[in-house]
Amino acid sequence: MDNNEIIGYTIGETRIDELTFLAKEAPKVGDYVKINYDDSELLGMVESTIQGNMALEDILNIEHLEKIREFEDNSSYYILGKIKVLGDIRDLNKDGALKLPRVPPKPGIPIYRADDELLKKVFGNGHLKIGHLVTREDVEVKLDANKLCSRHLAILAMTGMGKSNTVAVLLRELNKLKATVLVFDMHGEYKDIYCESEKLRVHIIEPKINIYRINDDDLCDLAGVDAQATKQRPYIRKAIKEIKEERKEHDFSTVDDYINAIIGKLEEYKSNDNYKKDESSIQTAIFRLEDMLQFRKNIITLHYNPINDIREHYINIIPMEELDENAVDIVVSYIAKAVLDDRKRIIIDKGRDFAKPIFMIFEEAHLIAPQHRKTRAKHYLSRIAREGRKFGVGLCLVSQRPKTLDAETLSQCSNLIISKLIEPTDQKHVQMASENLSEDLVKQLTSLNIGEAIILGPCIKVPAIVKVDKFDGRYGGEDLNLVELWEKDFINTERLKTDDIEENAFGDDDLFS
């Protein structure tokens, strides 16, 4: 189609943000158009189209329909569409979003297909190449890294629709910018990430918490002391308070020394006549602490500050796949708090010129910050979402279950990358969290293919339906090839059976008898 060719005309009552048009040919939903009138040069997105035939509107008899079809021609058909007005492209070189016009265009104004060169100016000036427009393969889409990281991001989609690939592409692009990234990797998908086109700077951080530095309730939770254990918890708190008054962290050489010191205090209480009535509860608390030493040894330590483990300008991966939900909550909250406090301290003590920006990616965000359940991590994610921008701490929530993700935290994510969502409750939850997600764009979510996404927010000049690049490398999020694995396992199993049969055939014979 000629870029200067008129594709249709505005009709009906027009608005500054939305137009109805009558088209010559059906444009692709998600494609871009241009409208010139008065002193404005507007860019718009085709949000929906319908086709009709006035001669067939009230036909209910199939024979009548077939007879009419014999005599009809293309002039009987009409195409109507809806355009979302995105703004005046004369503002394109200015910082920020395009501005809507003050006056809507009149009905009958011609509509043109936006040319590729214009769209390349709109979408090609960012830092992070994420993909290309679904409707224009030659138009690359690049996101503004400053606005993506500082105004927070949510990556939302059904399982298998390309979330992990999107994260991998973003990691590759952030790596090019020498960004400092921290990934809470719930399923170990990224710990072995490899890229063919770019040498990734990857640093693995083992999930650890300083048992001396966490608060008393977190220690009790980690030890498995029930939140309703109104006798066990006060005794543990009392023991910790006395220990910390007597000895500092450097006085303990190992975790065992510290926990055994607490257990020693509890043993003293147990043998004290004043606490005889609670002897059973105290003993249970001792058992819980002993169990913690045995079963939580992999994540508890002393003399540890997670900030010292984070490498600047690296993709820092924290594999969490071996931790249960409770341990994940404590580890995430502990590290998230440490990062926010550290970045705040740098700004307050040294000033903005010494800031150390960091972008934190939280996989399975609906488990860390659930909608209807209180968690420690949700508190700190919410704080980062509200305060992080001022201190260079960016947030990315990744989830396949948006409806169970905390709405307050999600609403602070101004940037959205949304792939296919079918459930109406998921769609509604996301729409309520984003004022920029129109009803017509929501309707597009069910028809997106694997790897396609709607991107909107400050990181992009105007909303776009994008084909996200296929990550050129390896990570752990791809679907398993079940048929291939079954076949391979079957061959190996049959080979072992054959070997056993051959071995048994000769095993009982004495060849030298």
Swiss-Prot record:
Keywords: ATP-binding, DNA-binding, Helicase, Hydrolase, Isomerase, Nucleotide-binding
SUPFAM superfamilies for the chain: P-loop containing nucleoside triphosphate hydrolases
Residues reported to bind ATP: 151, 160-165, 467-468
Molecular function, one GO term: helicase activity
Documented EC number(s): 5.6.2.3, 5.6.2.4
Keyword DNA-binding among record annotations: yes
Highest taxon of source: Archaea
Gene3D superfamilies: P-loop containing nucleotide triphosphate hydrolases (3.40.50.300)
Enzyme class, broadest EC rank: isomerase
Family (UniProt): Belongs to the HerA family.
The protein's role, per its UniProt record: A probably bidirectional DNA helicase.
Entry protein name: Probable helicase MJ1565
